[in-house]
Amino acid sequence: MRYPGGLSKAVTFSYDDGVVQDMRLVEILDKHGLKGTFNLNTSSFGPGKVNWSSRRMTAEQIVALFKNSPHEVAVHTLNHPFLEQLPPNMATYEVLGDRKNIEDIFGTVCRGMAYPFGFSFSA
């Protein structure tokens, strides 16, 4: 498999939840000409939305950081639930609702997704 420029290897950087530390990560990635994927929960922007809301960026900060940046913004569900514990219709709502919000906010097609809490099967 080849990547752009004929390269045979690639590295990815992926960060979840839209936390304030992402602002510093974007600075570092930009400084070195690297791109990252930032997986956002669009119902959890800003203070008062989740238990650790002081770590979350506001909607305004998210837009300012990513609206015209080279970084990918991807689905991470609306509310960060354990998807495997939800009925199929609720899991679908979480994923598609987050995708719609991201596409509305950034005016682009959203293709990526990261499962909240990771994903694994018990043996």
What are these language model-derived features?
Residues 18-19, 43:
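Short, glycine/serine-rich, charged loops/turns that create anion-binding
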Residues 1-13, 20, 54-56, 62-63:
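N-terminal pre-catalytic segment of deacetylase/amide-hydrolase enzymes
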Residues 19-20, 79:
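Short, glycine/acidic-enriched loop or turn micro-motifs at the edges of active sites
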Residues 22-23, 82:
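Generic hydrophobic alpha-helical membrane-span motif
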Residues 15-17, 115:
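Short acidic donor-binding/metal-coordinating loop in glycosyltransferase active sites
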